A protein has these predicted regions:
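Non-catalytic linker/capping segments at the edges of enzyme domains
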Residues: 1-52, 149-237, 297, 324
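HotDog/MaoC-like acyl-thioester-processing domains
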Residues: 2-12, 97-180, 278, 287-328
């Protein structure tokens, strides 16, 4: 389908699984790190990664993994106008460099937006995305909601708005086993200076320095993201930055404020509260909502509120992201 499906071309149960598989390489990892600037230690330090995880290759950055997975799903949302939220993203396995990712995308809900005078009709599409590796091992299983335009001339049915999408992702399954259970926390602590996990972090609010958004289309291309709004300014008058780019910068800022984060275990919620454009300057306010000891360290419940600097008015909030990170 040239240009991708419109909202009314989709049906619940429809599957998109023909995106190219992607082998994670050191080159991809380097380009990704150059764009988002993340400082997670294990993806950057192959020796440390081997000592902690026991894997034969360096751990792939979790942001690279979810960016590739999301990019593979854009066959269904090439015409997307906005991506509203993600739900239930949790790592069932942490890939390493050399692993190959395959993603299956299924339409699980459709809801037409209420018609507005002077605006073309649109609808919300809820998608379930399942990512496996070359050995059919589950990596990710999560949901997102995208707003798509309806086809020209499509008459919205005001009698039947569609599915209730409020519960999308609420029943996302937890991993069958902890993918970090065999990681060596003591090896990390021996090699990396403190501070390490401290339950007293709960309640802390940290404020980041800022980052300019650059190389936005390059990140989209790197991760197979073909949503036209990230590449073609004619779609909405200005290219919209891929939401994962904003998330990537938020995580990079978190790693500067908490330099001994080990990895991201999963997301509780992720809402794009405003648009981001190339050249915007973003900063974040990081709330440590919880700090819970686990067998090999601690799990930090984090909330990142990201803002875009404005020259002419109040700074705009653009992201509200709750996630859980592992700290040793």
């Amino acid at each position: 389908m040239s240009g991708g499906p419109y909202f009314d071309d989709l049906a619940v149960g429809q599957v998109f699984d023909s995106a190219p598989a992607v082998t994670l390489t050191a080159g991809m990892a380097a380009v990704h790190q150059a764009i988002v600037g993340d400082r997670l230690r294990l993806p950057l330090d192959a020796d440390l990664s081997a000592a902690v995880t026991g894997a034969p290759a360096a751990l792939a950055h979790p942001g690279l993994v979810w960016d590739v997975a999301i990019g593979q799903t854009t066959l269904a949302t090439q015409r997307v106008k906005a991506n509203l939220f993600y739900r239930g993203l949790v790592f069932h396995r942490f890939p390493v460099i050399g692993d190959t990712l395959y993603t299956r995308t299924e339409v699980v809900g459709l809801r037409a937006n209420r018609p507005k005078p002077g605006r073309a009709p649109t609808g919300l599409t809820a998608l379930r995305m399942t990512t496996i590796d070359q050995a059919d091992r589950l990596v990710l299983d999560f949901y997102r909601c995208a707003m798509l335009p309806a086809s020209p001339g499509w008459p919205p049915d005001e009698e039947r708005a569609g599915d209730d999408l409020s519960g999308v992702g609420a029943d996302a399954a937890a991993p069958a086993h902890d993918p970090t259970a065999d990681w060596d926390a003591e090896a990390f602590r021996r090699r990396v200076p403190g501070p390490h996990f401290d339950a007293g972090l709960a309640g802390t609010v940290l404020h980041s320095s800022a980052d300019v958004v650059s190389s936005a289309p390059e990140l989209a291309r790197l991760t197979l993201n073909i949503a036209a709004t990230h590449h073609d300014s004619r779609i909405s008058g200005r290219r919209l930055v891929y939401g994962g780019h904003t998330i990537g910068l938020a995580l990079a800022q978190a790693t500067r404020m908490l330099p001994n984060l080990v990895t991201v275990l999963g997301w509780q919620s992720c809402d794009h509260t405003g648009p981001v454009y190339e050249g915007d300057t973003l900063y974040s306010e990081l709330h440590v909502e919880s700090a819970c000891p686990v067998d090999n360290g601690g799990a930090l419940g984090l909330r990142s509120l990201v803002y875009a600097v404005s020259d002419s008015g109040p700074d705009r909030q653009v992201l509200d992201w709750r996630f859980t990170a592992l700290q040793f």
